[in-house]
Amino acid sequence: MKENTLIVRQLGRQRYLPIWQKMQDFTDTRDDDSADEIWLVEHESVFTQGQAGKDEHLLAPGDIEVIKVDRGGQVTYHGPGQQMMYVLFNLRRLKIGVRELVTWLEECIIESLAEYDIQAYAKADAPGVYVNDSKIASLGLRVRRGCSFHGLALNVNMDLSPFLRINPCGYAGMNMVQTKELKGPQNLETAGAGLVKHMIKKLNATQVKHTEGFENE
């Protein structure tokens, strides 16, 4: 059993579509002996439209690709300078439900930002994490065969202007903020390390393997 083993993959900057496909493939082929994994990645510019997504929230996507995906939620933007943390966990083995995993993700963000004296918080009616009514992180998950994929997006040091082309997560006029502006993590390496540190505690992982990329590539 791989209950307390965690693999953390640093994937660098990647196009969205191949990583989404790899998440699905991993989830479809894993078994009860597969270790849980965290994937840290930075995406090329893309809008992703969740399963509940409505086209009216895509105001003016322009030259940025729009991809309809299988996570929950509405439309959001991913791009350079934003830290993605994908959580490929066997929820049945962890004995948690999707709601508890959402709470874990929110707490990882809140706890890592608290180390910089940033007071972040979650909202019951609007998933994600906020600072002074501005959104700093988005969440979206899918569970298949009792296992999760997708995860969180933390705004770190990025061009926030593409968010003006959409209603982020379906909320018109939602203001976005990033850690750089708040004297938090200034780069993805620092931001990602903080998120992973807090998730390791929640998983009670005793064997953590850090690696870059995928095997056989």
UniProtKB/Swiss-Prot annotation:
Protein's pathway: Protein modification; protein lipoylation via endogenous pathway; protein N(6)-(lipoyl)lysine from octanoyl-[acyl-carrier-protein]: step 1/2
Entry-linked InterPro entries: aa-tRNA-synth_II/BPL/LPL (IPR045864), BPL_LPL_catalytic (IPR004143), Octanoyltransferase (IPR000544), Octanoyltransferase_CS (IPR020605)
Entry keywords, A to Z: Acyltransferase, Cytoplasm, Transferase
Catalysis: reaction(s): octanoyl-[ACP] + L-lysyl-[protein] = N(6)-octanoyl-L-lysyl-[protein] + holo-[ACP] + H(+)
Annotated Gene3D superfamilies: Bira Bifunctional Protein, Domain 2
Residues the record marks as site: Lowers pKa of active site Cys: 135
Protein family: Belongs to the LipB family.
Entry binding sites for substrate: 71-78, 138-140, 151-153
Name of one Pfam family that matches: LplA-B_cat
Organism: Pseudoalteromonas translucida (strain TAC 125)
HAMAP family: LipB
Gene behind the chain: lipB
GO MF annotations, alphabetized: lipoyl(octanoyl) transferase activity
CC annotations in GO: cytoplasm
CDD domains: LipB
GO biological process, one term: protein modification process
Superkingdom in the source lineage: Bacteria
Functional description taken from the UniProt entry: Catalyzes the transfer of endogenously produced octanoic acid from octanoyl-acyl-carrier-protein onto the lipoyl domains of lipoate-dependent enzymes. Lipoyl-ACP can also act as a substrate although octanoyl-ACP is likely to be the physiological substrate.
SUPFAM superfamilies documented for this protein: Class II aaRS and biotin synthetases (SSF55681)
Known EC number: 2.3.1.181
Descriptive protein name: Octanoyltransferase
Compartment(s) where it occurs, according to its Swiss-Prot or TrEMBL record: Cytoplasm
Lineage: Bacteria, Pseudomonadati, Pseudomonadota, Gammaproteobacteria, Alteromonadales
Further remark: In the reaction, the free carboxyl group of octanoic acid is attached via an amide linkage to the epsilon-amino group of a specific lysine residue of lipoyl domains of lipoate-dependent enzymes.
Main localization of the protein described in the UniProt heading: cytoplasm
Enzyme class: transferase
